[in-house]
């Protein structure tokens, strides 16, 4: 009994673009999982931080740029401080968000990009996140005033 194995060539252009935009050498990642273990938002992500890097290495551009993970990253830098190879995933996630917007690839969660914009604006205004004004800004941007109030 013979088993046929098909080998598919990986398109490295996404890896190269991500490296160029983020300034991070993603080939150094050996999947130790320290970034994911320390990430406070990882339990809410559809793709964990270590898997984002692996998927970039494998050229899975549409899946990465369409994931909620790139939008849920709060850039707390926990991943970068834990990484033995000093890969700053927060900077990578910023670059991936930019690429997602430029390519017009929508996130899985409705209005998640609006939440991210409100988060960034809150930091720009006061140097840190002010939850109340961020929430108001998000509600005004999304025009979604009642869904979280209705049981």
State each model region's role.
Residues 134-151:
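Intrinsic disorder at enzyme termini
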Residues 25-42, 68-87:
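Cysteine-centered iron-sulfur cluster-binding motifs in ferredoxin-type domains/subunits
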Residues 4-21, 44-70, 89-137:
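Ferredoxin-type iron-sulfur electron-transfer modules in oxidoreductases and energy-metabolism complexes
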């Amino acid at each position: 009994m013979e088993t046929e194995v098909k080998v598919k060539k990986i398109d490295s252009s996404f890896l190269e673009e991500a490296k160029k935009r983020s300034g991070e050498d993603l080939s150094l990642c050996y999947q130790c999982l320290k970034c994911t273990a320390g990430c406070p938002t990882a339990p809410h992500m559809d793709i964990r931080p270590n898997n984002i890097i692996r998927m970039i290495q494998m050229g899975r551009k549409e899946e990465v740029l369409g994931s909620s993970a790139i939008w849920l990253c709060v850039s707390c830098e926990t991943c970068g401080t834990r990484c033995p190879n000093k890969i700053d995933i927060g900077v990578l996630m910023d670059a991936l968000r930019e690429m997602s917007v430029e390519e017009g690839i929508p996130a899985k969660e409705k209005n998640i990009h609006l939440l991210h914009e409100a988060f960034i604006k809150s930091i720009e205004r006061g140097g840190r996140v002010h939850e109340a004004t961020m929430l108001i800004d998000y509600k005004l941007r999304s025009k979604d005033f009642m869904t979280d109030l209705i049981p």
